[in-house]
Amino acid sequence: MHALVMQHPCITAVLPSARSPEELDATGRQALASCDAIALALPAEAAIHWATALIELGVPRILDLSDARRRDPEVHYGIPELFGAPSAEARYVANPGCYPTATLLSLRPLLERGLIERESIAVLGTSGASGAGKGLADRLHFCNLAGNSFPYKVGEHRHVPEIEHHLGAPISFVTQLLPIVRGMLVTSFVRPKVEPAALLAGLREHYATHPYVTTLDQPDEGLGLGHVVGSHQALLAVGPVARSGLVPVFASIDNLMRGAASQALHNLNLWLGLDAGLGLPPPLARAPLGVPPAFATLLSTNSATNSELSHD
């Protein structure tokens, strides 16, 4: 998020040097207290500790990228296309996780419209190594992951309660690591109440006014991770009915951008009353086609093309 903020036309970063609130000197406390908003990219326990101190300092807006309060009914949950902008009076916004973002973008509109059954939802989430965190683990060593792929945290993934809470339905959820750095493809198997074309139409209707979500005609035309890595874009698609009666619904995102940093900035823009796309890579002008070169999308934070500097 720091790289995005540093190129934002309307936001100035304040970065006091302290590992805990107790280490802040008077200058650091004053600098934080003067901020319009503070983003916390910390583990949950540390985020709670810092948030408490920041509230005492009178910081008006706290954007938390941890999972500390993502299920708190008093906290705005920040997927703008699903839950809108934070209210001007809100003091706390919970930025969603990467797997929840992809899963909810693809399934929540279908459930809200009554197009799929609430039971028997099975989700396979595949992600690059960065999606498994920064902790030391054998599975993340290059010699173990390169040219390899395997499931992890089966039956105990911490994002399941978050997904079920905001989806309003139980799910079966399995995650699998890919031998890549970033990028996430989530495939959900659902039991439809209507034909797949109606599912696709439901997604298109919901996201018609949201340029950072693109619904594809076919899942095998443009769904590759190379189309989303380095971007804020989410790509969605619906497959045909299988012989089992289930339909696959797909979502691909960059787990480090839409699943974390760029979504945080999207929320912050809306919260501050700025243009939603300021500081973000521009949305796709059209749906991508075909298989992209591996990770051809380059990180770009030049937002002039989509904001036209509307606040100048």
What does each of the following model-derived ranges do?
Residues 1-145, 149-152, 239-242, 277, ...:
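N-terminal Rossmann-like NAD(P) cofactor-binding subdomain of oxidoreductases
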Residues 2-3, 7-30, 41, 118-125, ...:
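C-terminal substrate-binding/catalytic lobe of Rossmann-fold NAD(P)-dependent oxidoreductases
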Residues 66, 189, 254:
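Anionic group-transfer/hydrolysis microenvironments
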Residues 74, 98-105, 154-162, 198, ...:
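Conserved active-site and cofactor/substrate-binding residues in soluble primary-metabolism enzymes
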Residues 227-298, 311-312:
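C-terminal helical cap and adjacent loop that interface with cofactors, partners, or active-site loops
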